[in-house]
From Swiss-Prot:
This is Uncharacterized hydrolase SAOUHSC_01399. Disulfide bonds: none annotated. NCBIfam families: amidohydrolases. One of its GO terms (molecular function) is hydrolase activity. Keywords: Hydrolase. Gene3D superfamilies: 3.30.70.360, Zn peptidases. Belongs to the peptidase M20 family. SUPFAM superfamilies: Bacterial exopeptidase dimerisation domain, Zn-dependent exopeptidases. InterPro entries: Amidohydrolase, Bact_exopeptidase_dim_dom, Peptidase_M20, Peptidase_M20_dimer. It comes from the Bacteria.
Length: 383
């Protein structure tokens, strides 16, 4: 089969069989079977995900990463290859990322067989990008200890940019992503005896108001930050004073100092609830993803490789507010660079955003991704 047939076949198979973070067992088996067919050795440091390696002629070792997990979303696309898993969908394009890396593996194996693979290559089929921090898990598990990796590259499909456009930015390109949760515990009573209870309803209302004011009163208005409330609940019945409350959301920022400010303000909010409402209140933070930092030292190589892949380069003036665990590779492993590849095509109806039930794209864009990867490999220079 030709390369377009290859990416269409594999991407649509993966799209039909999405799996959630840390449960990508069939996806992992599919990748392993593909690598086995090429007689490529690989490791599985975690229960899911695969690390493959090919030795080249040069002394440098570079890595390419694709995330393999999906999202808990019910697909609404009316296509023959729609998800066969109820309420699970590749709504972030990771099926495309995985497919592009598979094709790149095949190209590299062909080059190796011909004695023409210029450098050593590590292929990272990473689990749990959406939740679970798969990149960090792999690093902590020692998955890369035996590889002297000098640079890590990755891409993400981007339905906000047209086909043929690659979006880049030095330094911060995505935000940190930190989840927070407030837990409230009061005392229930009948609504007719409201004074006998300690209401988590009014207390939660106070928390909502105070959180919504953090961005306005405590953060620099010239910086792009998000303090988002995603879900909240108090009580179980309409005629009782609620004895419990719950609120959760996410914080997006590029500045660690701003994140510290938000956390400190949330701790103060929790303390104020105890004083004002006689309700116990605790705030907890889940381990988040740091901002993705693109190494300026890799910029020239990235731009040249994209142009040679017939992609028009757009230098984004401000970072995205997405969270992305590719950030851990640049933070802990080696200089890294993350590129967004445009997939928007209004004529074909490929216009909906990431994490939506109608996300779709033309597989031909994946050929450009692989050309970009190969150009990087063929012209890699140590930084």
């Amino acid at each position: 089969m030709n390369e377009l047939e290859f990416v269409t076949k594999h991407r649509r198979h993966l799209h039909q069989h999405p799996e959630l973070s840390l449960h990508e067992f069939e996806t992992t088996a599919y990748i392993k079977a593909f690598l086995d067919s090429l007689n490529i050795k690989y490791d599985c440091p975690l229960e899911t995900g695969v690390i493959a390696y090919l030795e080249g002629n040069g002394s440098h070792t570079i890595a390419y990463r694709a995330d393999i997990d999906a999202l808990p979303i019910l697909e609404e696309n009316d296509v023959p290859y729609r998800s066969q898993s109820d309420h699970v969908m590749h709504a972030c394009g990771h099926d495309g990322h995985t497919t592009a890396l598979m094709l790149f593996v095949q190209r590299c194996k062909d080059m190796q067989d011909a004695g023409q693979l210029p450098q050593n290559v590590v292929f990272i089929f990473q689990p749990a990008e959406e939740t679970g921090g798969g990149a960090n898990r792999l690093i902590k598990a020692g998955a890369f200890d035996k590889y002297p990796i000098e640079a890590v590259f990755g891409i993400h499909v981007n339905p906000f940019a047209d086909e043929g456009i690659a979006v880049i930015r030095d330094e911060e390109i995505t935000a940190s992503a930190t989840e927070y949760r407030f837990f409230l515990t009061g005392l229930s009573s009948h609504v007719a005896d409201k004074e006998q209870g300690h209401s988590c309803g009014e207390a939660l209302q106070h928390v909502l108001t105070q959180i919504s004011q953090i961005q306005q009163f405590h953060l620099n208005g010239l910086k792009r930050n998000i303090v988002h409330i995603g879900h909240f609940k108090a009580g179980e019945a309409i005629n009782t004073v609620p004895s419990n409350g719950y609120l959760e959301g996410t914080i997006r920022t590029y500045d660690i100092d701003d994140l510290t400010i938000v956390k400190n303000q949330m701790h103060k909010i929790a303390e104020s609830v105890k004083l004002l409402f006689n309700v116990d209140c605790e705030v907890k933070f889940a381990e988040g993803y740091p901002p993705t930092i693109n190494s300026p030292k890799l910029r020239t190589q990235i731009e040249d490789a994209l142009i040679k892949a017939d992609l028009n380069v757009y230098d984004k003036p401000t970072p995205f507010l997405f969270g992305e665990d590719f950030s851990f590779y640049g933070q802990q492993l080696a200089p890294a660079y993350f590129v967004f590849i445009g997939t928007r095509n209004e004529d074909k109806g490929f216009v909906t955003g990431l994490h939506t039930s109608h996300l779709n794209f033309d597989e031909k864009v994946l050929i450009n991704v692989v050309n970009f990867y190969e150009n990087l490999l063929n012209n890699y220079k140590e930084v």
